[in-house]
A protein has these predicted regions:
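N-terminal alpha-helical interaction modules that lie
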Residues: 1-7, 61, 65-68, 98-105, ...
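Intrinsically disordered, compositionally biased glycine-rich interaction modules
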Residues: 111-120
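TPR/TPR-like (Sel1-like) alpha-helical repeat modules
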Residues: 27-42, 69-72, 86
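Amphipathic alpha-helical packing elements
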Residues: 78-112
């Protein structure tokens, strides 16, 4: 019937909405993700962080948690979209996001895989 009741309902609805680029969808994704978290679904925090970062990136502002990567076609490489330096790894951890050093390592792994694909 389309009614959201359980933590899973809220989580999956928020996860679907966070794929959108529309600010109103991202706002709703954030709300639903927090509701999922309040109902006991820890992954709701991570989806909320993704929605918040995606909104900031759309506004050309530094992201807070570090969930958004961009591809630079000219350099043929991935890059972590700029992150607000005031956000701590403790804050990231509370949202289910890895520390900044690990996020930067993930970028290197993406670029290593990209280079490997080019060489094959």
């Amino acid at each position: 019937n389309g009614t959201l009741v359980s933590a899973d309902d809220f989580l999956w609805a928020s996860a679907a909405l966070v794929t959108s680029d529309a600010p109103k969808d991202l706002d709703l994704a954030s709300e639903l993700a927090l509701m999922a978290a309040e109902l006991g679904e820890e992954r709701g925090f991570t989806v909320q962080a993704e929605a918040a970062d995606k909104l900031l990136v759309a506004q050309a502002r530094p992201q807070r948690y570090g969930t958004q990567y961009i591809f630079e076609p000219v350099h043929q490489r991935w890059k972590l979209y700029p992150v607000d330096p005031l956000t701590s790894d403790v804050e990231r951890r509370s949202m289910g996001i890895p520390p900044l050093a690990e996020l930067l390592q993930n970028v290197e792994e993406l670029n290593d895989a990209l280079r490997k694909d080019k060489d094959e």
